[in-house]
């Protein structure tokens, strides 16, 4: 979600929050209630897998504004139901304006659901799979003071995205992977001065 070329133009903190969320009500609510909060539920992890993949090349706010459309289109983020979607259903989604109508991204959500289920079977949960990339098996809490310090990827996201690519996942490179890890609380990048900073 955070990109250096955009971040360089932002204030570090706005109203006591990480400056990337600005003052947009939806963005602020997302920042305060979700971003960086530890996620243990695989259904929520699948939701963010779909949403972060859809965001590739777009703004995160665009995807947040279409989130309910994605929820409807992708069976309330039930990975099993999405994995069973047919080519005909993919075609129907190309006519649904509640999501970004990009055939490759829609098809990747379906194939990624199948790979997600495979990972669950192998590791017991997708969360366990994600944590397998962390040296001590625990989330990372960074202590950045400025948005410009936050990287677009790190060794964990590099290794995880590389492994996911080998497993067949699409639209999930190192930068998208890092955003996913931030969003789901595996990496806490709330700035040290942010009111949502994990204590």
Q: What does each model-found stretch correspond to?
A:
Residues 2-199:
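HhH-family (HhH-GPD) DNA N-glycosylase catalytic core used in base-excision repair
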């Amino acid at each position: 979600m955070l990109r250096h070329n955009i971040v360089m133009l932002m204030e570090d903190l706005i109203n006591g929050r990480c400056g990337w969320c600005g003052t947009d009500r939806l963005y602020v609510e997302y920042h305060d209630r979700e971003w960086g909060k530890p996620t243990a539920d695989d259904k929520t992890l699948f939701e963010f897998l779909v949403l972060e993949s859809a965001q590739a090349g777009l703004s995160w706010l665009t995807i947040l504004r279409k989130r309910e459309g994605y929820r409807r289109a992708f069976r309330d983020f039930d990975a099993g139901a999405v994995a069973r979607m047919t080519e005909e259903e993919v075609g129907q989604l190309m006519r649904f304006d509640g999501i970004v109508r990009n055939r490759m991204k829609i098809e990747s959500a379906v194939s990624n659901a199948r790979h997600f289920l495979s990972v669950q079977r192998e590791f017991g949960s997708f969360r366990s799979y994600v944590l397998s990339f962390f040296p001590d098996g625990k989330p990372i809490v960074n202590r950045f003071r400025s948005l410009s310090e936050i990287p677009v990827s790190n060794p964990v996201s590099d290794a995880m995205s590389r492994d996911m690519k080998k497993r067949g996942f699409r639209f999930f490179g190192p930068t998208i992977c890092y955003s996913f890890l931030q969003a789901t609380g595996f990496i806490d990048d709330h700035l040290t001065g942010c009111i949502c900073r994990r204590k």
